[in-house]
Amino acid sequence: MCIRDRSNNAVLDNILTRRSCRAYTDRPVSKEDLDTILKAAIYAPSGMSRQSWQFTVIRKKENIQELAKVVRETLNRPDSYNFYDPNVIILASNEKDNTNGLADCACAMENMFLMAQELGIGSCWINQLKEICDEPQVRAELKKFGVPDNHIVWGIVDLGYAAQEPVCKEKNENVIVFAD
């Protein structure tokens, strides 16, 4: 079981209990919950408030499976590779020339993960696309979904209802140094 915050701090409690989910049920994520998760994304900080990101939402299973197939083939992954078979994926992309693109998308993705946790929805960060976006077969697939040619997909947000309680691994708390 995950450690919970006992001070009634909902934000800290979400941070302490959020874990990556790698098995989902077939229960769909509602449009209302998806809109709430996406609102959390667009209110994330971005360098110089540039907000040059795009969040591409893919809800149809066959489209998710097709993208996973292209990634699987490009990376020579096993046939079982499927982004953990989520109900929804959100591609977090940003302009290639934005030096803050990765950090901006990471902030937005963390907001989505925490909002999903608050709504009882499981999530996982999939990071394979960043290195292969410009492979011809991958770029063609991304183009079908409306990802601009000048964007890198820095991460994929998997969403769905957890098929099982995610495992809470012990955290290393010996990483903080006060240099007063």
Predicted region positions:
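Acidic, surface-exposed loops and disordered segments
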Residues: 4-180
